[in-house]
Amino acid sequence: MRTKFLALLSVLMLASMLLSACGAPAAAPPAAPAATEAPAAAGAPAATEAPAAAAGPVTMDFVVWSYGLDTINDNIKKFEALNPSVTINLKDYSWLDYHDTIVGLMAANNPPYLLYGSDHWLNEWASAGWLVPLDKYCPNVAGYSSEVAPYALQGMTYNGEVYGVSYYADTQDFMYNDALLKKGGFTAPPATLDELYTQAKELKAKGVNEFPILFAWSQKEGAYPEAWTSLVFAQQQGPNAMFDANLEPAFNKDGSAAFQVMEWLRKVYSEGLLDPASLSTAEIDQVKAMQAGAHTFTIAPQYNMAELNKPASGDFAGQFKIGLMPGPSHATVGYVRFYAMTQKVVDAGPDYIAAACKFMDYFGGKTDGVYTVVKRWAVENGLGFAQLPLFDDADVIAAFGKWGDVPTIKENATMARSKEGLTTWYGSWDIFARAEIQKGILGQESSMDALNNMAAEWDKEKAAK
């Protein structure tokens, strides 16, 4: 009966969980090249302090979404050369199909051994017993966890246990065109929403932009609610900006951070500072519009900075900068994608557990004191990461310094927070919330009515579970 229930649950959650996802790097960075031969970090020896080698031959499948497959295969080849008793068979699915495919495999009792996971699916998959906690079986995970940005560790933790080692992690960043900002007479980006309003108003008055602010807040954009939540987090010191410890809505209280953001959004929209097209804009069009100089301010996943500042991409290449999220706390949303293993590994016995842990050490952990594979993704493909020591790595600084300010990137990572309320019903509620936020911005309902409707929907879905 439990399996049938899970299968039914999976179908009901199908569309909502996909749409709530932030797709990078499943579909990003937009212009990420196929991997070339890795720099020195790629050809590393076996991980130190690894679990005992498998006694016999072990073959495991590894399921990923379709991004950077050349790099993944090359990393597998290197891992197998160092661990000749272990064979890894790679299988990939598109990001758009990934969640449903994995859920279908799990519900049919045909899971992979190893796979990519995500913070917004962890509650669903771990509560069903499909994934197993890595810190229970792999001795080095605790050491890795101590060096991971808090938001990423939180995103890989369920019921106090760690279920992943980070493959990719990123933050929602406040970005601005420094050349246009200076044209408006400002030398520093806004630190608060009031300053952002003032600067945008001046830029419009001087004819720098018709609409100084642009967001990619189409209801189909997974990054839309994360960007909105980042603004909310930035207005509050500490947690529980959205939900309290009992998962009760906190966002619809008088004077809440969410209410402040909704009122501000309504103001900048009604005064012509926020481009009305924001409510139907997709991320790719957001990047193009910013490159064309049509707007000065935006919020987007950090990986877009590499595309914005790509040489010869436009008149403003090299002029885009990252600022802290405007607000008293400057907190933002961070998200994580990670390597995970299923119960199938444990059921297969000690040799498989040992091999899987060696895999985790090599792909998401350290090799001779270096996060080898994570560093390779960062240097070659510009992917964000959660392993804080890499911010001090000379190769990473050189690579990221081509399109961003590394100290600011690190500061965002340390202040970022995982989304609140990541439950099995979060995805479907998230879809509902997107429409309500837009109604509030458009003035179709008051800010508090929109937030109250979001709270009522949350309570309804929570009760149904």
What annotation goes with each model-predicted range?
Residues 44, 49-53, 119-172, 197, ...:
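Hinge/lid segment of periplasmic solute-binding proteins
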Residues 53, 304-315, 328-431, 463:
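C-terminal lobe and pocket-closing loops
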Residues 55-67, 86-91, 113-114, 163, ...:
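Short, well-ordered beta-strand elements
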Residues 77-148, 157, 179-191, 288-297, ...:
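Extracytoplasmic "Venus flytrap"/periplasmic binding protein-like
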Residues 158-167, 172, 197-249, 266, ...:
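Extracytoplasmic/periplasmic solute-binding protein
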Residues 200-201, 246-279:
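Glycine-centered hinge/linker elements that transmit conformational signals in sensory
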